[in-house]
Amino acid sequence: MKRTDNIALIVAAGQGKRAGEGLPKQYRQIAGKAILAHAIDNLLAHPEIDTVQVVIADGHQTLYQEAVGDRDLPQPVIGGVFRRDSVINGLKAAHDRGYKRVLIHDAARPFLPKTVIDRLLDALKSSKAAIPVLPVVDTLVNQEVEAVDRNLFHRVQTPQAFDLETVIAAHQAWTGSDEPTDDAQVVRAFGKKIALVTGDRLLEKLTYPADFSVAEAQMTEKMISVCGSGFDVHCFEAGDHIMLGGIKIPHDHGLAGHSDADVALHALTDALLGAIADGDIGTHFPPSDPQWKGANSTQFLEYAVALAKKAGAIIDHADVTVICEAPKVGPYRPAMRKHIAQILGLPEQRVSIKATTTEKLGFTGRKEGIAAQAVTSIRLPDILC
């Protein structure tokens, strides 16, 4: 892909204490994904944005990595004491990478329509700076409760777009005694005119606890519910235990397989892969590959969960049925349920582990092996919306 010389900078070094729940708001999840990840993905999806540079607080490295997963991004930059310090650090990183234009965005704005980015980049063709704004619709009064003409004011949003050299020079020249509320204020003080483009109501900043409930509802209303099913079989062989649902169960036989032959986790992995329509366990972990010889099947399910989350999925429920005459599954059901719930990120109440027999019919009835079937329920973004 041809480089456009446009980079996005997300300032995510704040603590966000007004949002509640202790976790910095940029790392809280809506619709199964960190707010920061939503902001990153919206920017990366635009064909005129080359990459996204994120600025984080020192000590947030683990939170950041959990939020972004395996997205192909530059290493995060550590922020400073104040927002402007963080912006400067991010701008330096963008400059070092040779970019010419930058879009500076708040991490706490998970909704970003492509049309807003289009308008900002178009404005930069004839201006050194551009910001998205909306009209003020509420009545405004001063502290003496005197009406103020709202037509003289705009609500300013992000991302704010700048010629990179200009915004760096503006920050270097800033002499204000107070911290600026945004970067447009810094550039305006530097004597540059700011172009105004139409923003979007979706670009609301998440600040207070109630904002997150609204954002969750907005995000999930554009999702569809889908199911996936999986089935697996392994025959018995010599051994003294089997792996089932990630739990070691003593038995007078083992299960034959290239990996640890955990039929429950294999069926569940296939169910999750089926829900996101991404092949099957054999596609991702072929038995012909020696690296999976004797592998713990927990990693297969963890991999499927990561793929599902990358696809924007919310996992809602899992149901596993083990089919065998022996061993007895009941005593190990709570441990299996707990193990699977932890991998899926679900409460145990949303994981069902059942066991049945075939009334001595077929290969399972003859105690020749074990079968398992699984169903998962998830929600995915509706690509047609």
Swiss-Prot record:
Alphabetic keyword roster: Isoprene biosynthesis, Lyase, Metal-binding, Multifunctional enzyme, Nucleotidyltransferase, Transferase
Region (2-C-methyl-D-erythritol 4-phosphate cytidylyltransferase), start-end ranges: 1-226
InterPro entries assigned: IspD, IspD/F, IspD/TarI, ISPD_synthase_CS, MECDP_synthase, MECDP_synthase_CS, MECDP_synthase_sf, Nucleotide-diphossugar_trans
Region (2-C-methyl-D-erythritol 2,4-cyclodiphosphate synthase): 226-385
Gene (UniProt): ispDF
Function (record text): Bifunctional enzyme that catalyzes the formation of 4-diphosphocytidyl-2-C-methyl-D-erythritol from CTP and 2-C-methyl-D-erythritol 4-phosphate (MEP) (IspD), and catalyzes the conversion of 4-diphosphocytidyl-2-C-methyl-D-erythritol 2-phosphate (CDP-ME2P) to 2-C-methyl-D-erythritol 2,4-cyclodiphosphate (ME-CPP) with a corresponding release of cytidine 5-monophosphate (CMP) (IspF).
Site entry (Transition state stabilizer), positions: 18, 25, 258, 357
Family label: In the N-terminal section; belongs to the IspD/TarI cytidylyltransferase family. IspD subfamily.
Entry binding sites for 4-CDP-2-C-methyl-D-erythritol 2-phosphate: 232-234, 258-259, 280-282, 356-359, 363, 366
Taxonomic source organism: Zymomonas mobilis subsp. mobilis (strain ATCC 31821 / ZM4 / CP4)
Gene3D superfamilies associated with the record: 2-C-methyl-D-erythritol 2,4-cyclodiphosphate synthase, Spore Coat Polysaccharide Biosynthesis Protein SpsA, Chain A
The protein's name: Bifunctional enzyme IspD/IspF
GO molecular function, one term: 2-C-methyl-D-erythritol 4-phosphate cytidylyltransferase activity
Record EC number: 2.7.7.60, 4.6.1.12
Pfam family, one: IspD
Keyword hit for Lipid biosynthesis: no
Site (Positions MEP for the nucleophilic attack): 150, 205
Binding site for a divalent metal cation: 232, 234, 266
Catalysed reaction equations from the record: 2-C-methyl-D-erythritol 4-phosphate + CTP + H(+) = 4-CDP-2-C-methyl-D-erythritol + diphosphate; 4-CDP-2-C-methyl-D-erythritol 2-phosphate = 2-C-methyl-D-erythritol 2,4-cyclic diphosphate + CMP
GO biological process, alphabetically ordered: isopentenyl diphosphate biosynthetic process, methylerythritol 4-phosphate pathway; terpenoid biosynthetic process
Listed cofactors: a divalent metal cation
Pathway in which this enzyme or protein is active: Isoprenoid biosynthesis; isopentenyl diphosphate biosynthesis via DXP pathway; isopentenyl diphosphate from 1-deoxy-D-xylulose 5-phosphate: step 2/6; Isoprenoid biosynthesis; isopentenyl diphosphate biosynthesis via DXP pathway; isopentenyl diphosphate from 1-deoxy-D-xylulose 5-phosphate: step 4/6
